[in-house]
Amino acid sequence: MTKPLLEVSACYRSFQAGEQQLTVLKDINLSIARGEMVAIVGASGSGKSTLMNILGCLDKPSKGAYFIDGQDTSQMDVDELAKLRREHFGFIFQRYHLLGDLNAVGNVEVPAVYAGKDRLERRDRAESLLSRLGLGERLDHKPNQLSGGQQQRVSVARALMNGGDVILADEPTGALDSHSGEEMMRLLQELHREGHTIIIVTHDMHVAQHADRIIEIKDGVIISDEPNLASQTAVKAQVDMSLAKPSGATRVAAWDRYAEALKMALLAMSTHRLRTFLTMLGIIIGIASVVSVVALGEGSQREILKSISSMGTNTIDIRPGLGFGDRRSARVRTLTASDANALKNLPYVDSVTPSISSSVTVRLGNKAVTASVNGVGPEFFRVRGYELAQGQFWDDDSVDALAQDAVIDDNTRKQLFPDSTGAMGSVIGQVIFLGDLPVRIIGVTKPKESAFGNSDALNVWVPYTTVSGRMVGKKYLDGITVRLDESVPSNAAEQGIITLLKMRHGTQDFFTINTDTIRQNIEKTTATMTLLISAIAVISLVVGGIGVMNIMLVSVTERTREIGVRMAVGARQSDILRQFLIEAVLVCLCGGALGVALAYLIGVVFAQAGGSFQMIYSTTSIVAAFACSTLIGVLFGFLPARNAARLDPVEALARE
């Protein structure tokens, strides 16, 4: 005796309805041979559709066994059942269940995509099947552009796409007019003659009369199973239903499934443009905030460090006392020019400048202004980064000779010589009085901008020996500034300077100010502020991610029937998971791209508005923004995608 193709043994199917258990199928025993055309007839609620779902591997018996070509399906997992549906079964639904976003060819191709067929091969087969079914002129039409009969023929072509060894037709004429219904039945009989196993589920005995065997079911029990002698169709060939068909699990096939998921994600996004944009909005704002804050922090930090550099890079200032605010500092008189000379001999010191400061009245003719007179060494201007606009600086000979030469800043020039413009030839060589001391102007410095603002103070620089010997009459210094070699760590050099001066003074009666320490503190403060504000901006990203999850849950609910159709034609759980996960990630990636664009726009507006510094965008922050948006898509898209993948195909198909 020939082994049956499909065999159901002692099958029961029960459902939980509240606190009651409803048994829909009761002790079903049924076998269907390869190449048969069988009609299962019954009234609504008889259990015929439930039996069809079990036969088509959309459902499993609650009790009993179901064998396909001798293999027990009860031992198969969901993906193995999906493989059977994909490679051996084809479904024709009463409501067609076509995917509205795809055209006729696209709908027919879907089973082949999940089977891993080559793109050109599946396109040729889809077009060939549709042409054979009389839809050669409707290949690019979407379901809403086709009549009921045409949609049903697309459904038939889809069922045949991967071979359709077993065709399960659920009320195939239920939504068609009588003429289209007759055409459909003739088509099913033709497929039967070609060797396909046809199982028709119907409530209409007239439709059942087209089959070679009629099984009648009532209240979940088979009450009749008789051959239909009036319709015995000669079968021309047998369709091969070996369970060892190639699975299509190649790398190219996997990429094709990714491409299909990406295409469907783009279609879903374009169908609901406004909703998609509003979903992205939280991501856009969050990414723009993070990128802009990092750019602002980087820009402000660079500007501040530039200002610190303008005051002298890699320098250490030495002041009397134990710190700012030390009341005893005015009585400490131990810093001397010999200390400066000793420091100059250290191997890691580039240059040294002593300093003595005093505030005096500067007079020129009948003009008198209050200015800060700074007695410094010849290398002071190099240490502090001053540049000449006119004239020259003095040298060591001027220091030794207590020369009465002065360099003034641009503010002093404007106050004393308001009419000097251009080459300023009238300034160089002019004599001004510092108190009662006449000095000759030999140079004018260029204006010096700072992120802290341009000072209005008036500065006059003369040799420190001149201030000490001719103006204030003191032998000690107000401070010493040391410029370090660029290759030396400033902290180590600072300790060396402190050690030397402690040895010379016998105690530590001075303190140091390391500009590198200031720079490090500013960098730390800026980084902390950037992190704090970015953390606040991340909240927007989290809110945006919750919005993505919410909309994806809505999308899963809206597209439940689509998910059911895809499962019916053989989609694995991983295929459904991938499709919705890609959609969530794509929404977040697009939001990330728009967020980065918005951040750049903010930078342009900031520059046009006259910001005091430029926003500096880093590649790292942009890459991190995209990585963050992708991560949000994965994290917040996983739950909806998992829910979609875990849907029961029978329930999904029944959902309106």
From Swiss-Prot:
Membrane topology: Multi-pass membrane protein
Disulfide pattern: none
Domain ABC transporter: 6-244
Main location: membrane
Pfam families: ABC_tran (PF00005), FtsX (PF02687), MacB_PCD (PF12704)
CDD domains registered for this protein in UniProt: ABC_MJ0796_LolCDE_FtsE (cd03255)
Enzyme Commission code(s) on record: 7.6.2.-
GO molecular function: ATP binding; ATP hydrolysis activity; transmembrane transporter activity
Localization per Swiss-Prot or TrEMBL: Cell inner membrane
The family this protein is said to belong to: Belongs to the ABC transporter superfamily. Macrolide exporter (TC 3.A.1.122) family.
Function: Part of the tripartite efflux system MacAB-TolC. MacB is a non-canonical ABC transporter that contains transmembrane domains (TMD), which form a pore in the inner membrane, and an ATP-binding domain (NBD), which is responsible for energy generation. Confers resistance against macrolides.
Protein name (database record): Macrolide export ATP-binding/permease protein MacB
Biological source species: Shewanella oneidensis (strain ATCC 700550 / JCM 31522 / CIP 106686 / LMG 19005 / NCIMB 14063 / MR-1)
